[in-house]
C-alpha cells in the first residue's frame, strides 16, 4: 500500500497561517490511514474541511477532527461511528506525529491530534499513523493560540484539505 500525503490549509480567525503536509503510514496502519485520507478528500460525503482545532495544549498537542460538532464531542469515521485500534506499533516520538484521539480502547472516529513534543505516555494507548512531512512550524505556531486548560484564544480552522 502506498503512503499517501495529505494537506491542511490552516487559518487563524479566517486569516491564512499556512499549509501543512502529512505523510500517512498506510503500509503499516492501512485502515486508520485510509480513514484520515478519505476525511481529508471528502470523497465519502463528509470531511475535515471547515472543522477547527478545538483543543490546543502548548508543549503537548493540537487536536481537531470534529466536523459533526465543533466542540470536540462529535466523532464519525468512514467505517461508521467508531472503529477498533488497528495496531499500536508506532511511537509518539516527537513534534509532528499524527495520532488518533480516542475515549479508550477501540474508540477511533474522526478526531486526531498532532503532537508538538515527545509524548511517550501515549504509546500503546493511541494509534500513531502519520507524521507532518512539511511545515511542522505551522503546527508549532498553532500552539501559541492554546492554553494549558486546552482552550483556544482564536479559531484555528482547516480551511481546505485534500490529497497530493
Swiss-Prot record:
The gene is PPIAL4C. PPIases accelerate the folding of proteins. It catalyzes the cis-trans isomerization of proline imidic peptide bonds in oligopeptides. It comes from Homo sapiens. It is found in: Cytoplasm. It comes from the Eukaryota. It catalyses: [protein]-peptidylproline (omega=180) = [protein]-peptidylproline (omega=0). Gene3D superfamilies: Cyclophilin-like. It is one of six related genes or pseudogenes found in a cluster, thought to result from gene duplication, on chromosome 1. This is Peptidyl-prolyl cis-trans isomerase A-like 4C. It holds the Pfam family Pro_isomerase. PANTHER family: PEPTIDYL-PROLYL CIS-TRANS ISOMERASE, PEPTIDYL-PROLYL CIS-TRANS ISOMERASE A-LIKE 4C-RELATED. Its EC number is 5.2.1.8. One of its GO terms (molecular function) is cyclosporin A binding. Belongs to the cyclophilin-type PPIase family. PPIase A subfamily. SUPFAM superfamilies: Cyclophilin-like. GO terms for cellular component: cytoplasm.
